[in-house]
From Swiss-Prot:
Taxonomic placement: Bacteria, Pseudomonadati, Pseudomonadota, Gammaproteobacteria, Pseudomonadales
Catalysed reaction equations from the record: a triacylglycerol + H2O = a diacylglycerol + a fatty acid + H(+)
Organism of origin: Pseudomonas fluorescens
Protein name: Lipase
Disulfide bonds: none
Coiled-coil annotated spans: none
TM regions (residue ranges): none
Length: 476
């Protein structure tokens, strides 16, 4: 059972659901964090932090910040629409739904009741080649707003965040019904008129949007005539968790918002480390970013009120890092509670920072550890146990500490180096160029053994004649 497997969909069905849910979630933000994401990747959180923050606000020639109308910025709104359409989804208009509530020029729907008017949601459809509606996607936006009204909308959403934690009983549970009760009825009617059932609906969202996903799941049995009781619910970075198994709650262990509430209850741990496992949550996925890696940043306590920790919360980091888990060759071996370290370092930090399990601000990690590299040139270090390491693309350097690791190299993986390889390790080559006979690929070069697959290679540093066991190499 894979780490993101959902209900009885099986692995491939669950992967498709995850990809759809992520595409819808990212679209709901309209690329709002594009400037920060690009600035962070180029400049990091160290000496380049000022440039990262400038990029977040003003963008650059290759990104759009949160301030609209900067002439040298690309149109990230257009890019967001193109991305969700490429994933197979198209926004459904208010007129098609017969809905008379507030909607903006982009087709985003706004909350209906007083106190919820800054909530936002997207409604999308997936169609076959003949134009027949196959599925409906509902994407709740997290705390933020369109660039033009970002400050006022964010303040309204922050009030909702506080009320969910500290306000009236069941505020979080009832949130989706209060904010979008009328719209969701129209969507249910529209779906039914096109021959769809709740099973054909994907509900997704991030942060406050993830809270809305859990809320809608909680309400689904008795609201909207029960239409959504069998819908598919995937929430990212939600502070709350719905009771039961309707929702798959996905998040980074070091995201201060994810699981901040116990169910929907606030307690003292909500303000600090909150790593309690829940039935519906992924509990041990780490975003190995500049903040997590830095001893200096971690002098300050881990807390939802410590703003630097929020780098682990941004939607772009979810889209990139979580998708690499989904596409990993180790996916089938990962369970809901596996320890998974995802490389999300900036370019400056990646050059001299070893990606590894620091087990920071969390309960002790147990069992095998999976480390997933990026498309850049990563430095990856295994621990003392049995690790599963996939460097990804780029020219990676991998340090082996235990001698009981499995290294996976897939497709065009670059020119990698393994330091400390031992015969008890396992090398797995998947979808690589050439034959499946190790003798066609292995050659001793000086004091090293080099395995070459077309333009890609792995150098086993310090491993000469007799140091490589054929039993420990799989080529497929």
């Amino acid at each position: 059972m894979g780490i993101f497997d959902y209900k009885n969909l099986g692995t491939e069905g669950s992967k498709t659901l995850f990809a759809d849910a992520m595409a819808i979630t990212l679209y709901s933000y309209h690329n709002l964090d594009n400037g920060f994401a690009v600035g962070y990747q180029h400049n990091g959180l160290g000496l380049g932090l000022p440039a990262t923050l400038v990029g977040a606000l003003l963008g650059s020639t290759d990104s759009q910040g949160v301030i609209p109308g900067i002439p040298w910025n690309p149109d990230s709104e257009k890019a967001a629409l193109e991305a969700v359409q490429k994933a197979g989804w198209t926004p459904i208009s208010a007129s098609a739904l017969g809905y008379a509530g507030k909607v903006d020029a982009r087709g985003t729907f706004f909350g209906e009741k007083a106190g919820y008017t800054t909530a936002q949601v997207e409604v999308l459809g997936k169609y076959d080649d003949a134009g027949k509606l196959l599925e409906i996607g509902i994407g709740f936006r997290g705390t933020s707003g369109p660039r033009e009204t970002l400050i006022s909308d964010s303040i309204g959403d922050l009030i909702s965040d506080l009320l969910a934690a500290l306000g009236p009983k069941d505020y979080a549970k009832n949130y989706a019904g209060e904010a979008f009760g009328g719209l969701l009825k129209n969507v249910a009617d529209y779906a039914g008129a096109h021959g769809l059932t709740g099973k054909d609906v994907v509900v997704s969202g991030h942060s406050l949007g993830g809270l809305a996903v859990n809320s809608m799941a909680d309400l689904s049995n008795y609201k909207w005539a029960g239409f959504y009781k069998d819908a598919n619910y995937v929430a990212y970075a939600s502070p709350t968790q719905s009771a039961g198994d309707k929702v798959l709650n996905i998040g980074y262990e070091n995201d201060p918002v994810f699981r901040a509430l116990d169910g929907s209850s606030f307690n003292l741990s909500s303000l600090g480390v909150h790593d309690k496992p829940h039935e519906s949550t992924t509990d041990n996925i780490v975003s190995f970013n500049d903040h997590y890696a830095s001893t200096l940043w971690n002098v300050l306590p881990f807390s939802i009120v410590n703003l630097p920790t929020w780098v682990s919360h941004l939607p772009t980091a979810y889209g990139d890092g979580m998708t690499r888990i989904l596409e990993s060759g180790f996916y089938d071996q990962m369970t809901r509670d596996s320890t998974v370290i995802v490389a999300n370092l900036s370019d400056p930090a990646r050059a001299n920072t070893w990606v590894q399990d620091l087990n920071r601000n969390a309960e002790p990690h147990k069992g095998n550890t999976f480390i997933i590299g990026s498309d850049g040139n990563d430095l990856i270090q295994g621990g003392n146990g049995a690790d599963f390491i996939e460097g990804g693309k780029g020219n990676d350097t991998i340090r082996d500490n235990s001698g009981h690791n499995t290294f996976l190299f897939s497709g065009h993986f670059g020119n990698d180096r393994v330091i400390g390889y031992q015969p008890t390790d396992k090398l797995v080559f998947k979808d690589v160029q050439g034959s499946t006979d190790l003798r066609d690929h292995a050659k001793v070069v000086g004091a090293d053994t080099v395995l070459t697959f077309g333009a890609d290679s792995v150098t086993l540093v310090g491993v000469g004649h007799g140091g490589l066991w054929t039993e420990g190499v799989v080529i497929g």
